[in-house]
């Protein structure tokens, strides 16, 4: 496997050439200081040979197949490790989420994978399509990875950054969604790590979801985020210079280099609280704003933002901003997240 990986020098190419399955390969030494193992197609683990690490880090991309910049970003980091330019000093699990959709150049094959975690893949119709099957496998790999880390002792930090890009433009180009975590403070250190990575906007979610990051946060108490790194572009057409800060901070993280983070300062970041989500209840749901409205566009109290079933849907707060508006989702799914500025969030 090592010869195969180093020969092709492109883990993404290997994954996309085998979108459904790759036989697992046991850990093999790399340059005398790193162990590399393959668990499945798009599932690669690096860990230091000496076992001396303190963090278990999951970097996932490609859960949506047309969100290519994070895929290219992670593939570049993988390539640098395989070719000896980077030496990982923490345990790292790289996941390329949806190879079939990447090959298609589409967001999904049959269903939105990022609504299928925390067991949702097996509810309703069950494991009825490739996204549901893959989501279940990805849960298994994350579980295995974090549980193997726990064997190395208590006090290890668990991290999961699920990387995406957005369909539409945004008033804040890069932003992160902090999953709902009742009874746990939000991490100021993590927020400032994101800021140093160029992600200066954070949304605090208000309820459980079935996203990949919520799965890791809830089940393993990981510092987990859904991170949006800009706008969707076709593979090979991303300006990777826009991700220089993100790449640098990820490199420091997996190589256990000093992060040099500023103390938490809410004036240096944009913090939003999710105040509600609006679900599609009937087929005639429609927004009143244009299809190219940017994420974080705000509307005043009383403004009609959508209609469905002959009823107007109004802005309820003094002002509410929209994120991820999509009127074309199936009935029963979320059409938009509504935001207000976060007031005194519990950050430690």
From Swiss-Prot:
Enzyme class, first EC level, given as a word: hydrolase
Cofactor requirement: Zn(2+)
Family designation: Belongs to the AspA/AstE family. Succinylglutamate desuccinylase subfamily.
GO MF entries: hydrolase activity, acting on ester bonds; succinylglutamate desuccinylase activity; zinc ion binding
Listed EC numbers: 3.5.1.96
Keywords, in A-Z order: Arginine metabolism, Hydrolase, Metal-binding, Zinc
Annotated binding of Zn(2+), by residue: 64, 67, 164
Pfam family, one: AstE_AspA_cat
InterPro entries: AspA/AstE_fam (IPR050178), AstE_AspA_cat (IPR055438), Aste_AspA_hybrid_dom (IPR007036), SuccinylGlu_desuccinylase (IPR016681)
Described purpose of this protein according to its UniProt entry: Transforms N(2)-succinylglutamate into succinate and glutamate.
Name of the coding gene: astE
Keyword presence, ATP-binding: no
Gene3D superfamilies found in the cross-reference section: Zn peptidases
Pathway(s) per entry: Amino-acid degradation; L-arginine degradation via AST pathway; L-glutamate and succinate from L-arginine: step 5/5
Catalytic activity annotation: N-succinyl-L-glutamate + H2O = L-glutamate + succinate
Keyword Hydrolase belongs to the record: yes
Active site: 228
Protein name in UniProt: Succinylglutamate desuccinylase
Organism: Shewanella amazonensis (strain ATCC BAA-1098 / SB2B)
UniProt remark on cofactor binding: Binds 1 zinc ion per subunit.
GO biological process, one term: arginine catabolic process to succinate
């Amino acid at each position: 496997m090592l010869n195969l990986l180093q020969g092709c020098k492109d883990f993404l190419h290997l994954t996309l050439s085998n979108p459904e399955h790759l036989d697992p390969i046991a850990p093999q030494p790399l340059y005398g200081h790193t162990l590399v193992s393959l668990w499945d197609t798009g599932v690669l683990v690096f860990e230091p040979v000496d076992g001396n690490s303190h963090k278990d880090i999951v970097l996932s991309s490609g859960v949506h197949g047309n969100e290519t910049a994070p895929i290219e970003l992670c593939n570049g980091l993988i390539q640098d490790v395989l070719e000896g330019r980077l030496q990982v000093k923490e345990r790292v699990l790289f996941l390329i989420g949806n190879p079939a959709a990447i090959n298609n150049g589409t967001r999904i094959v049959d269903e939105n994978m990022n609504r299928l975690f925390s067991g949702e893949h097996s509810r309703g119709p069950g494991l009825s399509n490739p996204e549901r099957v893959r989501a279940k496998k990805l849960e298994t790999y994350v579980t295995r990875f974090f549980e193997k880390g726990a064997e190395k002792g208590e006090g290890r930090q668990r991290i999961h950054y699920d990387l995406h890009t957005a369909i539409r433009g945004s008033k804040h180009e890069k932003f992160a969604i902090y999953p709902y975590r009742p009874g746990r403070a939000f991490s100021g250190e993590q927020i400032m790590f994101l800021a140093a990575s160029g992600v200066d906007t954070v949304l605090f979610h208000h309820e459980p979801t079935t996203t990949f990051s919520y799965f890791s946060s809830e089940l393993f108490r990981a510092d987990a985020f859904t991170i949006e790194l800009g706008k969707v572009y076709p593979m090979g057409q991303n300006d990777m210079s826009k991700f220089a800060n993100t790449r640098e901070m990820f490199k420091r993280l997996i190589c256990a280099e000093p992060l040099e983070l500023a103390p938490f300062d809410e004036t240096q970041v944009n913090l939003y609280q999710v105040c509600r989500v609006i679900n599609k209840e009937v087929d005639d749901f429609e927004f009143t704003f244009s299809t190219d409205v940017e994420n974080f566009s705000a509307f005043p109290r009383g403004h009609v933002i959508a209609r469905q079933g002959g009823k107007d849907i109004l802005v309820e707060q003094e002002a509410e901003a929209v994120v991820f508006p999509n009127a074309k989702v199936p009935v029963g799914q979320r059409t938009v997240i509504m935001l207000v500025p976060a007031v005194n969030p519990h950050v430690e």
